[in-house]
């Protein structure tokens, strides 16, 4: 999956998993990596106003009118998006989405809206495992590939189902996170019931797959489901509007090569299911490339708790583990990049690449943009002095 990108090298270690380092000095605002998610879903609460294909929300409050008439669970913003996605959707997750709210399935009182968004994601991935691996019945994307060529997606890093399976997963146990363990147990049970209901109740494949084979396939799906949940919980990305509203989630294995730091040197800029990773400030050759998984403007313990219970790892970055003087210095440094807009959690970055700072005059104006809301901040080269 990971082809050569100028200035990046993929490495791995037992403690940090796979990660990226700079193989040369990197300037401010460089495009380091562009990637498209392997699979993305709209939020359960916004699915009728957000497009399932481009994962973008219409500016108006009017509900979308184009939808999948088989499952009635996904909507599209226009005919082009529907034509690009509908056949693939109906090949994979459609028949499972159709039964998500079936009265035959057990009702779990601890399932909130976010849980159903997560279930839509997991079911989408498992439906690909069912079709591509168990049935050897991959969807042919000839037309989609033609569209991708027209959109210059050859610059993007693409992902496969195997890449999803290769993601690092952090185990959730009764000891490490009992609440999360209980929720995951319920999701695993629900998904097992869903696949039993759909596959054993299906009449379309009876002529080619007998019930014994279906039961064996369901067993294999059940074996995969918990692992997939662990992987996606640690590696998925939210898709946000400029108003800081989460309209969906995406799994993009190549994006997961950027480890977390509370003093990151990169940021991710999201456009629907597409992501571009940009350098925030000059990065030296040999340094690891990092982003932040969480809101940075929080006390140390709050950040550690969010990472522990949301991503299941203990943060070892210098901003969480240094002495008080160095932590204060790092707090002051990274806080300059926080967006000034109220409630926005984005970071200021430069859209164009900026040449070496010492070649610029001291009063040279540099325009920075927020990675979330596009708010503008005009600075001078001294802004980047540590």
From Swiss-Prot:
GO cellular component: nucleus
Coiled-coil intervals, chain numbering: 136-171
EC assignment: 2.1.1.-
InterPro entries per UniProt: H3K4_H4K5_MeTrfase, SET_dom, SET_dom_sf, Znf_MYND
GO biological process: methylation
UniProt domain SET: residue ranges: 6-294
This protein's record includes keyword Transferase: yes
One Pfam family hit: SET
Residue spans crossing the bilayer: none
The name this protein goes by in its record: SET and MYND domain-containing protein DDB_G0273589
Lineage, highest ranks first: Eukaryota, Amoebozoa, Evosea, Eumycetozoa, Dictyostelia
């Amino acid at each position: 999956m990971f082809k050569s990108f100028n200035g990046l090298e993929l490495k791995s270690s037992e403690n940090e998993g796979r990660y990226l380092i700079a193989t040369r000095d990197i300037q401010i605002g460089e495009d380091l990596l562009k990637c498209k998610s392997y699979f993305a879903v709209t939020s359960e609460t916004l699915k009728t106003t957000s497009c399932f294909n481009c994962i973008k929300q219409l500016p108006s409050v009017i509900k979308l009118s184009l939808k999948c008439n088989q499952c009635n669970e996904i909507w599209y913003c226009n005919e082009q998006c529907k034509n690009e996605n509908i056949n693939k959707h109906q090949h994979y997750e459609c028949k499972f989405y159709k039964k998500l709210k079936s009265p035959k399935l057990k009702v779990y009182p601890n399932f909130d809206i976010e849980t159903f968004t997560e279930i839509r994601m997991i079911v989408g991935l498992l439906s690909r495992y069912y079709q591509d691996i168990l049935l050897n019945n991959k969807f042919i994307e000839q037309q989609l590939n033609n569209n991708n060529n027209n959109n210059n997606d050859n610059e993007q890093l693409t992902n496969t189902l195997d890449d999803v399976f290769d993601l690092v997963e952090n185990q959730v146990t009764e000891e490490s996170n009992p609440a999360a363990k209980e929720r995951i147990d319920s999701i695993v049970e629900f998904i097992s019931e869903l696949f039993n209901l759909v596959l054993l109740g299906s009449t379309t494949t009876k002529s080619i797959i007998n019930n014994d084979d279906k039961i064996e396939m369901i067993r294999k799906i059940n074996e995969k489901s918990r692992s997939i949940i662990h992987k996606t919980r640690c590696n998925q990305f939210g898709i946000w509007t400029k108003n800081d509203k989460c309209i969906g989630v995406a799994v993009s294995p190549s994006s997961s090569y950027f480890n977390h730091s509370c003093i990151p040197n990169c940021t991710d800029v999201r456009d629907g299911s597409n992501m571009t990773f940009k350098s925030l400030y000059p990065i030296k050759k040999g340094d690891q490339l990092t982003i932040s998984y969480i809101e940075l403007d929080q006390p140390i313990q709050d950040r550690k708790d969010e990472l522990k219970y949301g991503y299941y790892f203990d943060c070892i970055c210098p901003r969480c583990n240094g002495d008080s003087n160095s932590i204060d210095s790092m707090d002051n440094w990274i806080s300059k990049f926080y967006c000034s807009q109220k409630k926005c959690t984005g970071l200021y970055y430069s859209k164009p690449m900026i040449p070496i700072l010492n070649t610029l005059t001291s009063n040279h104006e540099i325009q920075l943009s927020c990675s979330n809301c596009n708010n503008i901040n005009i600075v001078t080269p001294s802004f980047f002095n540590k």
